[in-house]
C-alpha cells in the first residue's frame, strides 16, 4: 500500500468498525483521508487518533445531496481526489420472508443506489485529476 502515500481518499462508513480498520491501513500508508459517517463522536475519535485525516458528517441515504458531499469532501482534500472507498451500508436483522417492501427498498437505496451515485460523482473528480 506504499503507492497510496499522499493520495487523497474519501472513506464512507468511517464511523463503524470496518471503516476504522480501513482508515488505519490508509493512514499507515500515508494517504490523506476524508472520513465520512453519521456518528460525530466516532468521527472526532478518528481525528484525534490519526494524522492526515479530515471528517465530514454525512448520511448516504440523502441521495439528493451526494454530489454536493463529494464536491465538499474533495475540496476538504485540497481539490483533488484519487480514490473513493464506498464502505457505508446497512443491514436489517430480518429474514426476507418477514421484511417489508419498505425495509427492502431502504436497504437497496442505501447499499446500491447511494454507492452508485458516490462512485459516479467521485469518478468525475478522478478523471479530472487523471488519477484513481
Tell me the role of every PLM-derived stretch.
Residues 29-44:
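Conserved glycine-rich Rossmann-like NAD(P)H-binding loop of the short-chain dehydrogenase/reductase
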Residues 95-96, 103-108:
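Substrate-binding pocket helix/loop in short-chain dehydrogenase/reductase
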Residues 7, 78-82, 126-132:
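Active-site loop of short-chain dehydrogenase/reductase
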Residues 119-120:
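A short, exposed helix-loop element centered on a Lys and neighboring polar residues
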